[in-house]
Amino acid sequence: MPAHVVTPPSLGRSFVPNLWDIVALVLIVGVMALVVYGGEQINVPLSALDNPAVSLDPWNLPEYALRTTLRMLTAIACSLLFTLVYATVAAKSRRAEMVLIPLLDILQSVPILGFLTFTVVFFMSLFPGRVLGAELACVFAIFTSQAWNMTFSMYQSIRNVPKDLEEASRSFHLSAWQRFWRLDVPFAMPGLIWNTMMSMSGGWFFVVASEAITVGNSTVTLPGVGSYVALAIQQRDLAAIGYALLTMLLVIIAYDQLLFRPIVAWANKFRFEQTSSGNEPTSWVLDLFRRTRALRALSVPFDAVTHSISNWQFRMPWRWPRGVAPKWLSRLLDVLWVLGIGVGAFYVGWRIYGQLSETLAFADVLNAVGLGLITLTRVVVLIALASLIWVPIGVWIGLRPKLAERVQPIAQFLAAFPANLAFPIFVVGIVQYGLNPDIWLSPLMILGTQWYILFNVIAGASAFPNDLREAASSFHLRGWRWWVKVVLPGIFPYYITGAITASGGSWNASIVAEVASWGQTQLQATGLGAYIAGATVSGDFPRVVLGITVMCVTVTLFNRLFWRPLHAFGERRLRLG
């Protein structure tokens, strides 16, 4: 009896397009047309921008939404590439980790306006007189608001790969390249996807600051939802703010349905478990493409290419065999590496000291450190309160995939809500009731960053192995014991990632949140953020540098002394497998 040959695309079915092919093709062509149209708008001369570039006419919002979304998707793609490289090197190399992770702590705490100050001139000089230079500067600013939490998530996942899976990869003699694509990336996928969602939502807050590019004495305003919101706030036009929020909601629903929900449903196969979960996430877009014939047939060559790339045998031409390298050589390299880091840190500190000592006294440093401790207290209290609220809610959502599907766009919209739109409510309330700004301006710091905790806890609960839940049920673990013995240890690494990024984001937001204004009314809280904001407005560059330096040092020390020991505890004691 002749053997039956199974065709790869559709198990022997006809290649004739069906109705689903037509629908999918229309969807693909429509998205590509929008991308091409948006791409054409970024390669025009600066003089081609309308004056004014942004109008509060709501009929312009569809085009503004398209251009802002393309900028954010471009930044997400760059953030993903950065994450795959940076997080992997930090997780795999002990010596690189000593530099890269503290550097990441510093980068996420540096205000986004600090990046804009140094990068706008560079990107504008690459394409002088073209809109593309301003677009790249805007994309880079959005990138700095998206990349850090994705990198922390990937780093945490690689460091917590189950030991039995590591042993299996060694027994199959996988190269480092093969292990990366077959083990590290799949295991990191749940957390990375939810952090990518958070990055997209968090980017909405920063487009308000990044779509108005200042070069010298001139300002280039790029058409987009962010610049629309900034103009609406400036003119105190509540109707325009409402139109912008509605546009944001529609855009979030669109990319949730077309991008994130299909990815979540597709990535469900990477869950680390031995039994099938009862309720799996679904996506009508993914189901649509799975029902096509011609498109699936056309995708076979691409699948073959990606499969062959993931199987490449990248190996070092020569290296010390495992366990053969002399111990003295390893120790010598460690000493030289630490010495190099110390010399570099001393040089940077000396240069900063040389710049500041000419204009500032030691009392100024003590004042900045004291203000930093006040802001640190705010951050710690707010992170603790946000954890008490969002950890139980995140676990409840993450363990129910169907509920997570419904909550997903709502959570993305809440995370995308620009915190500066809440300033009028807080300012009016504080003035009306005579409240203390030092206390009641503090929630503005966590308004946009609390979602890092929620999204990471949802990711951890979503990736929680179903067989462990069944084992807990068979042992009749309920109530407090279920939380302490089962769920909290399972989501702990994800929570730490969310808390670290929320903490760093809160430091960044303190510059905006500790000084809130609406119209002619301005309120100020005591803290390092208000110190930096005041120095920036007055043009006091030495105090700006001092404030940012104190902020970076405080964040790094706090992460080293508090968050990193907790992260190491999770790796050592709460690792699956």
Predicted feature descriptions by range:
Residues M1-A77, L245-A384, F558-G577:
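N-terminal, non-cleaved signal-anchor transmembrane helix
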Residues A75-L104, L382-A411, P424:
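Transmembrane-helix boundary motif in ABC transporter permease subunits
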Residues L81-Y86, S93, L100, A137-F140, ...:
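Membrane-embedded alpha-helices of multi-pass transport/permease systems
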Residues D105-S145, Q412-T449:
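Generic hydrophobic transmembrane alpha-helix motif, especially the helices
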Residues V120, A137, A141-V161, E167, ...:
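Transmembrane-helix bundle segments that line or gate the permeation/cavity pathway
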Residues S153-L192, N456-T497, I532:
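Short cytoplasmic-facing helical segments at TM-TM junctions of multi-pass membrane proteins
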Residues W177-S210, Y243, L259, P443-L447, ...:
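Transmembrane alpha-helices
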Residues F205-L238, N508-V545, V550, L574-G577:
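Glycine-rich helix-loop "coupling/hinge" segments at transmembrane-helix boundaries
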